């Protein structure tokens, strides 16, 4: 695993930018809190975590979009730059330092959020559209009041 920790001002600046772009104004995000963005969909986490092909598809879609490195923001306050192949957007995946997480690229035109309440949220019009076009049963697995 190739993981570079980002410290101090840079980490804070990146986190602030992500929160601004994605209307994240509390510790928890969509669907646990309201969000002004309309390009979001929240799934029951089991829908993705229990199907290895879905995780592989997420990685493939991001790679096809030219994404090689991403930012990982953990609820512990730590920020990392990781390779796309090291993306595991699941609650608690990283053991003791796990918990909730946000993942996005430096363009911040997409986002993934894994919550403590068993949801995985995807944001970004292109990413949400791609997931819906391939995961034909997606409507059966949206969580809470997912907008789409």
Question: Predicted segments — roles?
Answer:
Residues 1-148:
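Structured alpha/beta or helical-core interaction and ligand-binding surfaces enriched in interleaved
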